[in-house]
C-alpha cells in the first residue's frame, strides 16, 4: 500500500485521494483547519461539490434580509406577531436585546477559538474512534463515510445529559463557557416557547408532558470554517434544515450563512448579515411537524471563504429522544387535516445522521402520503 500524503508542503494538485484526505484530516485529527494551515494552493478532490450543489453569487437575493426583532418587549402583541410571522414566512429571524449577556457570547467565541487552536493530537482525543463517550465528538464535514463530496468544516459536537457527564467528558478548554451559555439561554428558550407555541399555536400550556416533547434535550456544536483555496468548488455546510425544535445560532462577524427564500422560484438565497450582539433563531423540522406545517424549517447553507476563517456556535433545542413528533391537537382542532404522521424523535434523528445533507428530504419521513 502506498504511503498516505502528509500535506506537509503547499503542493496539491486537486487529485488527492479519499485515503489521503481521511488519514490526514480524520485519523490524525488535523481537520480541514490543518489543510488550510498547510497553505495548500488547490482544494483536494474529495471536497469538490457536484456542479448542481455549488453556490453562485447570482443566486443571492440582493437587498434582502431575514427579519430583525427586538426582544426587549418580548410578550407585547407587536413582538409576538413579528416572531410568529417570521416563523411562518421565513423560518429564520435575528434577535437583539435577547437577554443573553453579551460578555457570555464573547466568551463562547473565545473558547471556540481556543478549542480549535489545540494541537491535532489533543483534538483527536474526541474523535469518533477515540472519544470515551458518544455524546462528545470532534470531526470534519458531516457524515464523511457516506458523502460523495466532503464539506469544508471542522466541528465539536456535545450532547448535554447531565452536569456530572459534562464535567467529566466535555473538553475543559471550552466546557465552562458552553455551560454558562446554555444556562444563560434558558430564559430565552422559555420565552420563545411561550410566543411560538402558547400564543402562536394556541396550545393551552406547556406541561410536564409537552415540555420534554418540545425542549427536552440540548446539543451544542462548535463549528470552524477555515479559509479555503478554492471556495467556489466546495461548501462549508450543504443544503439542509435542522431537525431541532428550533436552533439558536451565534456567529462571528465574517458571514457566510445563506437562507433559502420562500418564493416562486425556490432557488434564491438571502445572506444573513452578522449583527453584533445578535442571535439567529431558526425553526427546526420538529416544530414544523408539531405546527402541522404552519411554521417552516428552511433550507440553509454555509459558503466557504477564500480569505478568512469563520466560527459559529449553534445551540440545538431538541425534543427528548423518546418523544413522539406529531401535530398538536390544538392545531388540528378546527378540522385541519394532519400533514404529518407520528414519528419517534430518535428515529427521525437517526435518519438525519445516516445520510449526507440533502435539503428538506428528511421531513419526508414524517409526511402522510
Curated annotation (Swiss-Prot):
Cofactor: L-ascorbate; Fe(2+)
Binding positions (Fe cation): 240, 242, 300
Molecular function via GO: 2-oxoglutarate-dependent dioxygenase activity; 4-coumaroyl 2'-hydroxylase activity; metal ion binding
Annotated InterPro entries: DIOX_N (IPR026992), IPNS-like_FE2OG_OXY (IPR044861), IPNS-like_sf (IPR027443), Oxoglu/Fe-dep_dioxygenase_dom (IPR005123)
High-level lineage: Eukaryota, Viridiplantae, Streptophyta, Embryophyta, Tracheophyta
Residues noted as binding 2-oxoglutarate in the record, renumbered to the chain: 225, 310, 312
Family: Belongs to the iron/ascorbate-dependent oxidoreductase family.
EC number of this enzyme: 1.14.11.61, 1.14.11.62
Annotated pathway: Phenylpropanoid metabolism
The keyword Cytoplasm is annotated on this UniProt entry: no
Biological process terms in GO annotation: coumarin biosynthetic process; phenylpropanoid biosynthetic process; response to UV-B
UniProt keyword NAD present: no
CC cofactor note: Binds 1 Fe(2+) ion per subunit.
Catalytic activity: (E)-4-coumaroyl-CoA + 2-oxoglutarate + O2 = (E)-2,4-dihydroxycinnamoyl-CoA + succinate + CO2; (E)-feruloyl-CoA + 2-oxoglutarate + O2 = (E)-6-hydroxyferuloyl-CoA + succinate + CO2
Segments forming domain Fe2OG dioxygenase: 209-319
Protein name: Bi-functional coumaroyl CoA and feruloyl CoA ortho-hydroxylase Diox1
Functional description taken from the UniProt entry: 2-oxoglutarate (OG)- and Fe(II)-dependent dioxygenase (2OGD) involved in scopoletin and umbelliferone biosynthesis. Converts feruloyl CoA into 6'-hydroxyferuloyl CoA, and p-coumaroyl CoA into 2,4-dihydroxycinnamoyl-CoA.
Enzyme class per UniProt: oxidoreductase
Lineage top rank: taxon: Eukaryota
Organism: Ruta graveolens
Annotated keywords: Dioxygenase, Iron, Metal-binding, Oxidoreductase
Amino acid at each position: 500500500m502506498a504511503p498516505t500524503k502528509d500535506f506537509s508542503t503547499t503542493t496539491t494538485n486537486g487529485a488527492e485521494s479519499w485515503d489521503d484526505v481521511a488519514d490526514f484530516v480524520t485519523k490524525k485529527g488535523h481537520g480541514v483547519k490543518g489543510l488550510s494551515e498547510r497553505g495548500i494552493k488547490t482544494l483536494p478532490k474529495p471536497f469538490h461539490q457536484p456542479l448542481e450543489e455549488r453556490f453562485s453569487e447570482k443566486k443571492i437575493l440582493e437587498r434582502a434580509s431575514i427579519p430583525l426583532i427586538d426582544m426587549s418587549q418580548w410578550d407585547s402583541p407587536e413582538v409576538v406577531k413579528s416572531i410568529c410571522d417570521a416563523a411562518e414566512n421565513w423560518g429564520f429571524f435575528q434577535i437583539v436585546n435577547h437577554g443573553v449577556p453579551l460578555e457570555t457570547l464573547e466568551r463562547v467565541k473565545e473558547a471556540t477559538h481556543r478549542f480549535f487552536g489545540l494541537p491535532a493530537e489533543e483534538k483527536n482525543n474526541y474523535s469518533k474512534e477515540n472519544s470515551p463517550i458518544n455524546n462528545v465528538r470532534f470531526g470534519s464535514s458531516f457524515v464523511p463515510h457516506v458523502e460523495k463530496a466532503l464539506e469544508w468544516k471542522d466541528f465539536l459536537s456535545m450532547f448535554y445529559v447531565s452536569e456530572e457527564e459534562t464535567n467529566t467528558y466535555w473538553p475543559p478548554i471550552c466546557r465552562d463557557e458552553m455551560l454558562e451559555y446554555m444556562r444563560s439561554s434558558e430564559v430565552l428558550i422559555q420565552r420563545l416557547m411561550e410566543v411560538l407555541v402558547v400564543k402562536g399555536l394556541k396550545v393551552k400550556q406547556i406541561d410536564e408532558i409537552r415540555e420534554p416533547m418540545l425542549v427536552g434535550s440540548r446539543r451544542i456544536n462548535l463549528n470552524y470554517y477555515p479559509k479555503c483555496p478554492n471556495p467556489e468548488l466546495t461548501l462549508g455546510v450543504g443544503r439542509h434544515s435542522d431537525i431541532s425544535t428550533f436552533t439558536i445560532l451565534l456567529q462571528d462577524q465574517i458571514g457566510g450563512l445563506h437562507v433559502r427564500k420562500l418564493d416562486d422560484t425556490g432557488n434564491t438565497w438571502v445572506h444573513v448579515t452578522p449583527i453584533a450582539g445578535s442571535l439567529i433563531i431558526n425553526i427546526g423540522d420538529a416544530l414544523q411537524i408539531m405546527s402541522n406545517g404552519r411554521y417552516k424549517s428552511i433550507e440553509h447553507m454555509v459558503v466557504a471563504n477564500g480569505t478568512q476563517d469563520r466560527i459559529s456556535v449553534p445551540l440545538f433545542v431538541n425534543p427528548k429522544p423518546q418523544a413522539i413528533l406529531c401535530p398538536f391537537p390544538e392545531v388540528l382542532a378546527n378540522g385541519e387535516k394532519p400533514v404529518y404522521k407520528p414519528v419517534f424523535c430518535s428515529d427521525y434523528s437517526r435518519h438525519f445522521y445516516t445520510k449526507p445533507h440533502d435539503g428538506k428530504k428528511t421531513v419526508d419521513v414524517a409526511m402522510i402520503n
